[in-house]
Regions:
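Short, acidic loop-to-helix structural element flanking the phosphoryl-transfer center
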Residues: 2-32
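Intrinsically disordered, low-complexity segments enriched in small/polar residues
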Residues: 1-2, 111
Length: 158
């Protein structure tokens, strides 16, 4: 119902270090959110979390017409972003099925965010696994980029 959906997007508690990590990554990468769900709920959550300003693009299944883990979801998002080199893309997520299997279906590297240290009993095989968001930086950034964190003139082009 409408009231329920409007309330869902009002609250969002970002993961520990989310803002700082996104700020660092935004200096060297294009950041896109890919999410199954309802557009206004996901946009509301991003705004409520204070992270929306750090996101370059948002792709939600309601608007995309297909859900993760379908390869078409990722293919469409990459096309809209103008990404030709899939080797420069990393799908990061906490869902082995939607995020990790979905990214793999699209031929993309994946990183499973697993802060609780859960066992992977699925068939999905992440390229990387992290317990803390901060652990993304050395995966995504070259050493020179890690050294340049804080210098916004060093941004990647997709």
């Amino acid at each position: 119902n409408e009231y329920y959906l409007s309330r869902l997007g009002e609250k969002a508690i970002p993961c520990e270090d989310a803002r700082e990590v996104l700020k660092d990554l935004a200096e060297v990468a294009t950041i896109a959110v890919v999410s199954n769900g309802v557009e206004r709920v996901q946009q509301g959550r991003l705004t409520a979390s204070g992270l929306a300003e750090l996101i370059d693009a948002t792709f939600v299944s309601e608007r995309m017409g297909v859900t993760k883990p379908n390869r078409k979801f990722f293919d469409s998002a990459l096309h809209i972003l103008g990404v030709n080199n899939r080797e420069k893309v990393l799908v990061i997520g906490d869902s082995l099925r939607a995020d990790i299997q979905g990214g793999s279906n699209a031929g993309l590297a994946t990183c499973w965010y697993n802060p609780r240290g859960q066992e992977n009993a699925s068939g999905a095989k992440p390229t990387f696994e992290i317990a803390r968001l901060r652990d993304l930086l050395p995966i995504v950034m070259e050493q020179e980029e890690l050294d340049d964190v804080g210098n916004p003139a060093k941004r990647h082009m997709v």
